[in-house]
Each structure stands twice: as structure tokens, then as C-alpha cells.
Swiss-Prot record:
Its main location: host cell. It comes from Acidianus bottle-shaped virus (isolate Italy/Pozzuoli) (ABV). The lineage of its organism: Viruses, Viruses incertae sedis, Ampullaviridae, Bottigliavirus, Bottigliavirus ABV. This is Putative transmembrane protein ORF92. It is a multi-pass membrane protein. Coiled coil: none annotated. The chain crosses the membrane at residues 11-28, 32-52, 54-74. One of its GO terms (cellular component) is host cell membrane. It is found in: Host membrane. Keywords: Host membrane, Membrane, Transmembrane, Transmembrane helix.
Length: 92
């Protein structure tokens, strides 16, 4: 038992929740936000991971949600503002 309660099973639950939310959020993002759907989809996915981490008691999903949120916000900033293009390797 670790100090923060993150073990292998908990991290696997987070990866499964990441995989389950991935396809749905990209479909929603592509349907409603055609210009920068990838960044919006990652932000929606991060919010779903935050909610599901508390619902399924998964610290792994919470950690992955923070990582996905940081990537999503970085992509959104890179796509909407040319000063932040260095955040996305495809735009730099």
C-alpha cells in the first residue's frame, strides 16, 4: 500500500477509462467544433476523466486527466494563437 493509494490496478482503471472516453470525445469534438476539434476533444476528455475518477475511485484516471488537460489546453492555445505555436510540434 503506497502513501497516495496509487497501485497498478488503479492505474489500469485509469487507462481503461482513458480508452473508453477517447472515441466519444473525438466524435463529439469533430461534430460540434470542426476547426479545432482535437484540442476541444482532449479538454472534454479530461473533464470526463476527472468525473469518472471520483465515480470509479481511480487516482490513475485523475492523474491521466491532468495530463490530458494540459495537452488539450496547449493544443487549443497553439491552434488559436500563433504565439503559442511552439506548444504543438505540428504547428511549430
Amino acid at each position: 500500500m503506497s502513501l497516495i493509494g496509487l497501485d497498478l490496478f488503479d492505474f489500469v482503471k485509469g487507462i481503461v477509462l482513458l480508452a473508453l472516453t477517447s472515441g466519444a470525445t473525438y466524435a463529439i469534438g469533430k461534430q460540434f467544433f470542426s476547426s479545432n476539434y482535437c484540442a476541444i476533444a482532449r479538454i472534454i476528455q479530461a473533464l470526463l476523466l476527472f468525473a469518472s475518477s471520483f465515480l470509479f475511485d481511480s487516482a490513475g484516471a485523475l492523474i491521466l486527466g491532468v495530463i490530458v488537460l494540459i495537452i488539450g489546453v496547449g493544443n487549443y492555445l497553439a491552434e488559436t494563437n500563433s504565439k503559442f505555436a511552439f506548444l504543438d510540434p505540428n504547428l511549430a
